[in-house]
């Protein structure tokens, strides 16, 4: 899931280049856009099965996850500021959507479920370097939904033996990234200061 996004589009591209069969769920939209997948070369796009749909639709994800070896779950609402304005939409997409994907992984006996989380689950650092032992401390509705999703993933491992890997990336950056993210903002500020 999340193949249309910043990290997801890079993952999709890399998996195709490595010769894997790739299927991704992208949100339906009236523009018929596949997000960042639209910018990939045609030879890459020709090797991706793209399904438009909603991870909040349990029967849809259950059906589309059949005969899948690994689920890379990256789909999420990610804007921290917007999470304060619409926390329920974050719970629906980030928590219920993750639950649906975990249930699909369980029912379809996937070999591995990769839950993509965020460093935001740690809040302000209580010690550095931050390790997995750092306390979880949601400082936004977004972070709270990611903690809930991570804990659901671990519960599916503990309760149902669904093989789970939780990734918590810190400040990813690169091509296709939103200019509002931390690293592009810092770079933009440096460039602006040099022009003064």
Which ranges hold each PLM region?
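N-terminal Rossmann-like NAD(P)+-binding domain of SDR-like oxidoreductases, especially those catalyzing
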Residues: 1-172
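Generic alpha-helical structural context detector
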Residues: 103, 154, 184, 188-192
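Glycine/proline-rich active-site loop of Rossmann-fold NAD(P)-dependent oxidoreductases
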Residues: 147, 172-186, 193-196
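Juxtamembrane helix-loop transition sites at the ends of transmembrane segments
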Residues: 47, 138, 189-195
